[in-house]
UniProtKB/Swiss-Prot annotation:
The gene is CRO1. It is found in: Endoplasmic reticulum lumen. Phosphorylated. The keyword Metal-binding applies. InterPro entries: Calret/calnex, Calret/calnex_CS, Calreticulin, Calreticulin/calnexin_P_dom_sf, ConA-like_dom_sf. Residues 217-262, 356-385, 402-424 have a biased composition (Basic and acidic residues). Molecular calcium-binding chaperone promoting folding, oligomeric assembly and quality control in the ER via the calreticulin/calnexin cycle. This lectin may interact transiently with almost all of the monoglucosylated glycoproteins that are synthesized in the ER. One of its GO terms (molecular function) is carbohydrate binding. An alpha-D-glucoside binds at Y119, K121, Y138, D145, E328. This is Calreticulin. It comes from Oryza sativa subsp. japonica.
């Protein structure tokens, strides 16, 4: 009896486990695109010929970079300064309607970027990938952009009705020379989240943080401020009166401490007058004091009315066609490395992917970078020392030449004196 009960218990546990696994499988995220730039990556990506005829198209290198956490973990890196870059990959077309969309990738600016982009684009429809460039329409643009001191931010741009809409929030990007993971999550409730290195940096409503739709309400264009509306917050104090004789107070008065010089001659110098000084009693033009207006009604504002041009879009977050991912940018200084692309509908899956790629190597990469910087500083210090030695050698050589010239001049002078003596 006990054995039968135990068998029933095992069976129930097995069923429960099976149901749990089925539940996990049912909610498991879907991966629409993933790229770690391993073997065969070139067959999945198309290098654009955009700007090639102008000799302004930059080349991509397949590399792990100058410093890394794993030399076998490679991405693609811009390799030429002052060049345009464009490359794209196609994946099975889908729409994020009624589902979450996650776009994630890592980027490293090894060149200490001072002007250039590090963003990616999602595109729909049919794209001629060989002609993919700056004028190619896109659905989403996301990622860091740096240029000088004024631009150091994460771009998040949505294209709706053939118009690019920029996020109204300022989201700072990373500016060091290490790899960082940028994640954009778009939820079907029209909210979004931006993360850097799996840490949330910005979130909110797409309705509020982008001007995609016209406002729901507008000021009534027909409304006029009533003529008797009192919008003066302060008024002159009727009890405040100007003192008698106030206007007669002079701005300057003769200096009472001034004395006529003893050698002053009225006939020759004219009548002496004391110099003037600012009058301490003079307070400037009289101004009536002001008091709060008891009838103040506040600043008049036109009443708000429903905007006749507003039309709600419950799918403001959605894009009907997402079919390509592309990198299109201009770089003054090359060296930006892209890796670990992921498009999915599961934020947790994206978080795990980031930890298993970037997170796994970030400490080793930081150590490699620190070692490279240390070596660079030592080489620069050694070169500076060599330059100082060269300068010292040049100075010593100049001194020797000067001494030789002085000795030569002295000898010539002696010979000349001897000749003159002989002549005498």
């Amino acid at each position: 009896m006990a054995i039968r009960a135990r068998s029933s218990s095992y069976a129930a546990a097995a069923v429960a486990l099976a149901l749990a696994l089925a539940s996990v499988a049912a909610v498991a995220g879907e991966v629409f695109f993933q790229e770690k730039f391993e073997d065969g990556w070139e067959s999945r990506w198309v290098k654009s010929e955009w700007k090639k005829d102008e000799n302004m198209a930059g080349e991509w290198n397949h590399t792990s970079g100058k410093w890394n956490g794993d030399p076998e973990d490679k991405g693609i890196q811009t390799s030429e300064d002052y060049r345009f870059y464009a490359i794209s990959a196609e994946y099975p077309e889908f729409s994020n309607k009624d589902k979450t969309l996650v776009l994630q990738f890592s980027v490293k600016h090894e060149q200490k970027l001072d002007c250039g982009g590090g963003y990616v684009k999602l595109l729909g429809g049919d794209v001629d990938q060989k002609k993919f460039g700056g004028d190619t329409p896109y659905s989403i643009m996301f990622g860091p952009d740096i240029c000088g001191y004024s631009t150091k931010k994460v771009h998040t741009i949505f294209t709706k009705n053939d118009k690019n809409h920029l996020i109204k929030k300022d989201v700072p990007c990373e500016t060091d020379q290490l790899s960082h993971v940028y994640t954009l999550i778009i939820h079907p409730d029209a909210t979004y989240t931006i993360l850097i290195d799996n840490v949330e940096k910005q979130s909110g409503s797409i309705y509020e943080h982008w001007d995609i739709l016209p406002p729901k309400q507008i000021k009534d264009p027909e409304a006029k401020k009533p003529e008797d509306w009192d919008d003066k917050e302060y008024i002159p104090d009727p009890e405040d009166k100007k003192p008698e004789g106030y206007d007669d107070i002079p701005k300057e008065i003769p200096d009472p401490d001034a004395k006529k010089p003893e050698d002053w001659d009225d006939e020759e110098d004219g009548e002496w007058t004391a110099p003037t000084i600012p009058n301490p009693e003079y307070k400037g033009p009289w101004k009536q004091k002001k008091i709060k207006n008891p009838n103040y009604q506040g600043k008049w504002k036109a009443p708000m009315i429903d905007n006749p041009d507003f039309k709600d879009d419950p799918y403001i977050y959605a894009f009907d066609s997402l079919k390509y991912i592309g990198i299109e940018l201009w770089q003054v200084k090359s060296g930006t490395l892209f890796d670990n692309f992921l498009i999915t509908d599961d934020p947790e899956l994206a978080k795990t992917f980031a930890e298993e790629t970037w997170g796994k190597h970030k400490d080793a990469e930081k150590a490699a970078f620190d070692e490279a910087e240390k070596k660079k500083e030592e080489e620069e210090a050694a070169k500076a020392g060599e330059d100082d030695d060269d300068l010292d050698d040049e100075d010593a050589e100049d001194e020797d030449k000067a001494d030789e010239k002085a000795d030569s001049d002295a000898e010539d002078g002696k010979d000349s004196d001897d000749e003159k003596h002989d002549e005498l």
